[in-house]
A protein has these predicted regions:
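Long, Lys/Arg- and hydrophobic-enriched amphipathic alpha-helices
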Residues: 104-109, 277-449
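Short glycine-/acidic-enriched loop or helix-start segments at secondary-structure transitions
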Residues: 146, 226-228, 336-337
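A short SAM/SAH-binding and catalytic strip from SAM-dependent methyltransferases
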Residues: 201-206, 210-235, 298-306, 310, ...
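A mobile, often basic/glycine-rich helix-loop segment
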Residues: 215-283, 343-348
Length: 449
């Protein structure tokens, strides 16, 4: 059963058992495909650039190769007709074997109810006296977009549906086409839905600043955003940024450490450290740490969500009145890669999943996905809105945001219809299987400083 649970596209990872690829196997696999080493040319690159290429390279990246495996289920699961968890797992196994898909997203597994919960959250919070504008980043198969538009068509005032627009920002051309087909099944949706095939984190793709209120939806986007890695020799040494370089005369990659100099990394480090307790900065504690680190030196690594910071900086700049709904992992089990907020690097073949021991082994055949520190996400959101000021920031107007972090079960109990995903014995996979995921909601306020 463990292998089919992975097909949830990671969301039930606390059930997930994997086979770790040995160094010997990794080297053998690497010798068959040199894409990962070709990511790095003669000059070193930052870890975030390596990860971006490994995932999103147009020809060899993981999502370019796996876009066809993003499944669209022919029909919704009739949860109320299943006896219990065992019957549910058997049914899932049958679906995956019939479809030959690597994974279905949760919005697909629980359609239309997952998307309906998001739509209800939007309708309760949005100002429906102005045209409703929704952007979805990384829209997958289009099931979320269709579910939200269906719900608004059936439950909102007619003028709200008639005047709404829904824009998907999708980096994959093949997924963009699937989204058009999925949403286009309802003819009245077609004039309201559009796909822009581009990178949402690229400021130039957005054009002029859009001052109208809008919603931005990001489901399982944060986990695949590029991260940077910083390194310290011990508990008190300064952080250094990590670069990836190719070893001379060898088809292998190694890490290179440099003093912090990248502006995005430096901003992210400052946000991470913003709420550091004043006692941690005291000279007495600093001296104690120094003695301890010399007696028991321990290298440190920390993964930084610089891709998230970059994306939110872009969104707040071009959509200053946006409201945000994001859902992702709050933690990942059995992570073997070193560092705080470290990712899982996992590949799947012939129905079984395998975890790599190093992110450097990713070569377009492996998903690289990170846990989301939702409190840090909140800090980044406040920084990008201008409310949180860092040392040395230029004076600027900032708007406070009203935010809330909810477990997936709490979100769906508040905004969804949990009875629709409950099995006969009371087991509810949407509420019971997603303990390692959360929702983040953020809306602008009128408070300015």
């Amino acid at each position: 059963m463990a292998s089919l649970v992975f097909s949830f596209r990671k969301l039930s990872l606390f059930f997930h058992t994997t086979r770790v690829i040995s160094c010997q196997e990794s080297c053998a696999v690497l010798s068959r495909s040199f894409f990962s080493t070709h990511i790095v040319g003669d000059e070193p690159i930052l870890v975030r650039d390596f990860i971006h290429s490994a995932l999103y390279d147009a020809n060899h990246g993981y999502f370019a190769q796996r876009s066809r495996s993003v499944g669209v289920m022919e029909r919704s699961i009739k949860f109320n007709q299943l006896e219990g968890r065992k019957a549910y797992m058997i049914y899932l196994d049958k679906i995956y074997k019939q479809s030959d898909m690597s994974w279905f997203t949760p919005v697909e597994l629980f359609k239309p109810w997952y998307a309906h919960g998001i739509a209800e959250a939007i309708m309760r919070t949005a100002n429906l006296s102005v045209p409703l504008k929704i952007y979805e980043i990384g829209g997958g198969s289009g099931t979320c977009a269709k579910g939200i538009m269906d719900y608004i068509m059936l439950n909102a005032p007619t003028r709200v549906y008639n005047n709404m627009t829904y824009t998907s920002v999708e980096i994959s051309p093949s997924l963009a086409e699937i989204q058009r087909q999925t949403v286009g099944e309802v003819r009245s949706h077609q004039s309201k839905f559009s796909v822009e095939c581009r990178d949402a984190a690229d400021l130039s793709g957005w054009g002029e600043v859009k001052e109208q209120p809008c919603w931005v939806i990001m489901l399982e986007v944060l986990d695949n955003l590029p991260h940077d890695l910083i390194y310290s020799e011990n508990q008190v040494s300064s952080w250094m940024e990590v670069w990836v370089e190719k070893q001379l005369e060898r088809e292998s990659l190694v890490e290179l450490y440099k003093p912090l100099q990248d502006p995005l990394i430096k901003r992210c480090v400052e946000i991470v450290n913003f709420n550091e307790n004043d006692q941690a900065k005291s000279s007495l504690l600093s001296k104690a740490k120094g003695v301890w680190s010399r007696a028991f030196p321990k290298p440190r690594k920390c993964w930084l969500p610089t891709g998230c910071l970059n994306l939110l900086e872009v969104l707040h700049r071009v959509l200053p009145k946006m409201s945000l709904i994001a859902s992702d992992f709050s933690y990942l089990p059995d992570v073997r890669i070193a560092g705080e907020r470290a990712p899982l690097v996992s590949t799947k073949a012939h129905g079984s999943s395998s975890d790599y021991e190093s992110y450097l082994d990713a070569k377009g055949d492996a998903d690289i996905f990170f846990p989301t520190d939702f409190l840090l996400l909140e800090q980044i959101d406040h920084y990008c809105s201008g409310w949180l000021k860092l040392h040395g920031d230029k004076p600027k107007t900032g708007k406070k945001r009203r935010t809330i972090i909810l477990d997936t079960s709490s979100f769906m109990e508040e905004f969804g219809l949990p009875s629709k995903t409950r099995l006969k014995d009371g087991y509810n996979p949407l509420l019971d299987d997603f303990k390692n995921t959360k929702f983040y909601l953020s809306v602008p306020t009128h408070n300015i400083k």
